[in-house]
Regions:
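Phosphate/nucleotide-binding beta-alpha loop and adjacent structural elements of enzyme active sites
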Residues: 2-277
């Protein structure tokens, strides 16, 4: 069903060691987070035109969007440029400070410093200096550590501490802010729990997945849950391709079959798109 990916070459191992030294040096002089944020910003600017074109198929002017796992706001920025209002949800202090600095006075952005789950309350968030991989899923972290993803063997992939964060649900957000046209979810392995907190259809949802056996099965459980909410069709993309792989949207059983046939590659991620009809 799944194929195991190849191991590092000798050159690859040397490269990982060099990168590890660089990461540790940046941490030592306390510039790692800044350098990482700048690199992400440059990548997002380079990719912005493609993102605008891609998301325009889901989002129109004056639509409401949810950005769940907003991080530094790369998708929030795209949604705003498409004319949408955005509820941006992010539990990490370092990210929320940057979001407030950039969007705090923007009346079209509603910033929520919480995480999303299937119930309201309090949960544990594992924090990484590489803030895009902070997670509430210990299984996801374990899978990542044992993967062949680039840089995973370096100290860039560490979770230095854990904090308690307030959590709410998608249903609660909808009650408070309205029904979104599009909901983007990127929460590092916690997507199923997030969508379990949704009980009514919205126009479109995207959620991240990793094509490994464990997480494809979780993605399929997520697909099954969405199918209990309403009539829904699916597509998917890989990495930052901003391209839907399938020419036509397919039903839950078909997308599940497609995902099960993907080769096991933990260094690749993707997004599943669900469209209620």
């Amino acid at each position: 069903m799944f194929k195991k990916s190849t191991s590092y070459t000798k050159f690859g191992l040397i490269l990982m060691k060099v990168l590890d030294v660089c990461v540790n040096l940046m941490r030592l002089v306390r510039i790692y987070s800044t350098v990482y944020a700048i690199a992400l910003a440059l990548l997002n600017v380079t990719n912005r035109k493609k993102l605008l074109k891609f998301y325009s198929q889901f989002i129109k002017k004056d639509d409401l969007c949810f950005d769940i796992g907003a991080n530094l706001g790369s998708r929030t920025e795209v949604f705003l440029r498409l004319g949408a209002k955005v509820v941006a949800v992010e539990p990490q202090n370092i990210c929320m400070k940057k979001l407030k600095k950039k969007y705090g006075s923007n009346k079209k952005v509603f910033l929520i410093q919480k995480a999303i789950s299937d119930n309201e309350g309090e949960e544990e968030l594992m924090i990484s200096d590489t803030h895009t991989i902070s997670s509430m899923s210990k299984n996801w972290m374990k899978s990542l550590k044992s993967s062949d993803m680039l840089l995973v063997s370096t100290s860039a992939f560490q979770w230095q501490k854990s904090i308690k964060v307030q959590v709410t649900t998608l249903d609660r957000l909808i009650k408070e802010y309205g029904r979104p046209t599009f909901c983007k979810i990127d929460v590092e392995g916690y997507e199923y729990k997030v969508l379990k907190g949704l009980s009514k259809p919205i126009d479109a949802v995207s959620f991240e997945f990793i094509p490994t056996q464990e997480f494809v099965l979780i993605a399929i459980d997520t697909i099954k849950h969405l199918a209990t909410i309403g009539k829904v069709m699916f597509n998917y993309s890989l990495g930052e391709s901003t391209t839907l792989v399938l020419e036509e949207w397919v039903e839950p059983e078909k997308i599940s079959s497609i995902l099960l046939k993907l080769p096991q590659k933990t260094f690749i991620w993707g997004d599943i798109y669900a469209k209620f009809i």
